[in-house]
A protein has these predicted regions:
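Membrane-embedded architecture of ER/inner-membrane glycosylation machinery
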Residues: 7-8, 12-264
Length: 264
């Protein structure tokens, strides 16, 4: 028992550290929060184990606050999944309400939302109804099984039918450009923020040139290769004062693409 209590405290401390650090850092990348996956999973499994193995007098009884939090959160997630395809199919009507130019352009990206994207939300809603029935009849094993099965199918469906289309809206144009340069001997750089997309999708081997990731060198020095830059439309001000020559070669869904022209 003491070992379990000590492990639980250690896991809780780790989760708190991750949450605090992730709240402080400015660059919000999912990899930074991945350390929270194990503590969250452990604590959830521990709570379910206690729920299923509770004493006969307490068996199947869920604290009112936990029950309310669980069903409210699940219902809100299901509602978002169900409403999202209708929202995304009609972005032309309200994209102008957003002040950020990148958000506007991203929402207006040509992505085919069919309506089937609501399926994860419907599965979650159905599972929520079944689980509510089992909670009322105090059947903890059935509650746990329904929860696990519902979340497995909901997550799998969301990753399959929703997330790829969200990716097309937010980063699709940039990824398409990077992939078009994968077979060209060139430099590609992202201006105005940190990104790994140019490194991954251009499929470039690690270069011998130590300046390959130096934006100042790529923008102002002689590179000897075609040099391309990608920047979000709401960050074009970062190019103000640039004394070199760049030619805009395209823009799409909130991204602007430039090629640097070197002086002879």
């Amino acid at each position: 028992v003491m070992r379990l209590v000590g492990s639980e405290m250690c896991i809780r401390d780790r989760l708190c550290v991750v949450l605090v650090i992730f709240s402080i850092v400015q660059t919000k990348i999912v990899h930074y929060s991945s350390l929270a996956y194990f503590p969250v999973t452990f604590l959830a499994a521990l709570a379910m184990e206690r729920f299923c193995m509770s004493s006969p007098s307490e068996k199947g009884r869920v604290p009112k606050g936990l029950k309310m939090a669980l069903f409210t959160t699940a219902f809100l997630i299901a509602a978002v999944f169900i409403a999202l395809p209708f929202f995304m199919k009609n972005t032309v009507h309200f994209a102008g309400q957003f002040g950020n130019e990148f958000v506007k352009a991203s929402l207006l990206a040509d992505v085919n939302w069919t309506g089937w994207e609501m399926l994860p939300g419907l599965v979650l809603l159905a599972g929520l109804g079944v689980m509510f029935w089992f909670v009322r009849t105090k059947r903890p094993i059935a509650v746990s099984t329904t929860l696990f099965v519902t979340m497995t199918f909901t997550t799998s469906l969301a990753v399959t039918v929703i997330f790829p289309k969200v990716l097309q809206h937010t980063q699709g144009a940039a990824i398409e450009f990077y992939q078009s340069k994968a077979t060209e001997d060139c430099y590609v750089d992202h201006i105005g923020g940190k990104s790994f997309l140019d490194l991954f999708y251009t499929k470039k081997p690690f270069p011998d040139n130590p300046n390959h990731a130096d934006s100042y060198w790529l923008m102002r020095k002689k590179t000897g290769k075609p040099t391309y830059f990608v920047i979000r439309i709401d960050r074009l001000h970062k190019l103000e004062g640039y004394d070199g020559k760049m030619v805009e070669i395209g823009r799409k869904d909130g991204f602007v693409f430039y090629e640097r022209i070197e002086n002879e």
